[in-house]
């Protein structure tokens, strides 16, 4: 699910601490290091997600595409999130900050008086990461992000296997369709406009 939206929607449910054995091949609680944060500092593409809760499913289905930029602050343990999401054939921009809980291996976001957590699962070899939600609860969920919008058969298989490992079915996965992206061209035009504006400003005496 989209990074910003999933953390907002999850304010409806508390994150349950892992009291049961973790699902096979999914390791939670790996500490987040400076190296991890530097690796996360990049442009990311939301590829898809699987959620059991009906509210989450509905939210996932509204997202046509999404990409975002993560800019970590190693001193304050926060991450700046700039998100470009295509919904209803319209580009929507979101900006927020995420908290980093290094020892627990989680990211968090404040939604009012509630702090929502998600376990970070990094797959550096494949240039991807996942966010795990409520894996010990019936309303569990898993979302998938990559550095490129092209979902190769290998990456698709990796996420499908991860979904099965957490006790869900492949049929519950909703992948995005990047042919419906409305933000990339809009952002490109905006950047070109900003460059032209800067040039004109420099010309002025």
From Swiss-Prot:
<feature type="glycosylation site" description="N-linked (GlcNAc...) asparagine">
    <location>
        <position position="25"/>
    </location>
</feature>
<dbReference type="GO" id="GO:0071378">
    <property type="term" value="P:cellular response to growth hormone stimulus"/>
</dbReference>
<dbReference type="GO" id="GO:0032715">
    <property type="term" value="P:negative regulation of interleukin-6 production"/>
</dbReference>
<dbReference type="GO" id="GO:0002439">
    <property type="term" value="P:chronic inflammatory response to antigenic stimulus"/>
</dbReference>
<keyword id="KW-0732">Signal</keyword>
<dbReference type="GO" id="GO:0005615">
    <property type="term" value="C:extracellular space"/>
</dbReference>
<dbReference type="GO" id="GO:1904681">
    <property type="term" value="P:response to 3-methylcholanthrene"/>
</dbReference>
<feature type="glycosylation site" description="N-linked (GlcNAc...) asparagine">
    <location>
        <position position="104"/>
    </location>
</feature>
<feature type="glycosylation site" description="N-linked (GlcNAc...) asparagine">
    <location>
        <position position="94"/>
    </location>
</feature>
<keyword id="KW-0011">Acute phase</keyword>
<dbReference type="GO" id="GO:0031100">
    <property type="term" value="P:animal organ regeneration"/>
</dbReference>
<feature type="signal peptide">
    <location>
        <begin position="1"/>
        <end position="18"/>
    </location>
</feature>
<dbReference type="GO" id="GO:0009410">
    <property type="term" value="P:response to xenobiotic stimulus"/>
</dbReference>
<feature type="glycosylation site" description="N-linked (GlcNAc...) asparagine">
    <location>
        <position position="134"/>
    </location>
</feature>
<comment type="function">
    <text>Functions as a transport protein in the blood stream. Binds various ligands in the interior of its beta-barrel domain. Appears to function in modulating the activity of the immune system during the acute-phase reaction.</text>
</comment>
<dbReference type="GO" id="GO:0032496">
    <property type="term" value="P:response to lipopolysaccharide"/>
</dbReference>
<dbReference type="GO" id="GO:0032720">
    <property type="term" value="P:negative regulation of tumor necrosis factor production"/>
</dbReference>
<dbReference type="GO" id="GO:0071300">
    <property type="term" value="P:cellular response to retinoic acid"/>
</dbReference>
<dbReference type="GO" id="GO:0032760">
    <property type="term" value="P:positive regulation of tumor necrosis factor production"/>
</dbReference>
<dbReference type="GO" id="GO:0032732">
    <property type="term" value="P:positive regulation of interleukin-1 production"/>
</dbReference>
<dbReference type="GO" id="GO:0002438">
    <property type="term" value="P:acute inflammatory response to antigenic stimulus"/>
</dbReference>
<dbReference type="GO" id="GO:0033197">
    <property type="term" value="P:response to vitamin E"/>
</dbReference>
<keyword id="KW-1015">Disulfide bond</keyword>
<feature type="glycosylation site" description="N-linked (GlcNAc...) asparagine">
    <location>
        <position position="76"/>
    </location>
</feature>
<dbReference type="GO" id="GO:0071385">
    <property type="term" value="P:cellular response to glucocorticoid stimulus"/>
</dbReference>
<feature type="glycosylation site" description="N-linked (GlcNAc...) asparagine">
    <location>
        <position position="34"/>
    </location>
</feature>
<dbReference type="GO" id="GO:0032731">
    <property type="term" value="P:positive regulation of interleukin-1 beta production"/>
</dbReference>
<keyword id="KW-0813">Transport</keyword>
<keyword id="KW-0325">Glycoprotein</keyword>
<dbReference type="Pfam" id="PF00061">
    <property type="entry name" value="Lipocalin"/>
</dbReference>
<keyword id="KW-0964">Secreted</keyword>
<comment type="similarity">
    <text>Belongs to the calycin superfamily. Lipocalin family.</text>
</comment>
<dbReference type="GO" id="GO:0002682">
    <property type="term" value="P:regulation of immune system process"/>
</dbReference>
<feature type="disulfide bond">
    <location>
        <begin position="91"/>
        <end position="183"/>
    </location>
</feature>
<dbReference type="GO" id="GO:0006953">
    <property type="term" value="P:acute-phase response"/>
</dbReference>
<dbReference type="InterPro" id="IPR000566">
    <property type="entry name" value="Lipocln_cytosolic_FA-bd_dom"/>
</dbReference>
<dbReference type="GO" id="GO:0036094">
    <property type="term" value="F:small molecule binding"/>
</dbReference>
<dbReference type="InterPro" id="IPR012674">
    <property type="entry name" value="Calycin"/>
</dbReference>
<dbReference type="InterPro" id="IPR001500">
    <property type="entry name" value="A1A_glycop"/>
</dbReference>
<protein>
    <recommendedName>
        <fullName>Alpha-1-acid glycoprotein</fullName>
    </recommendedName>
</protein>
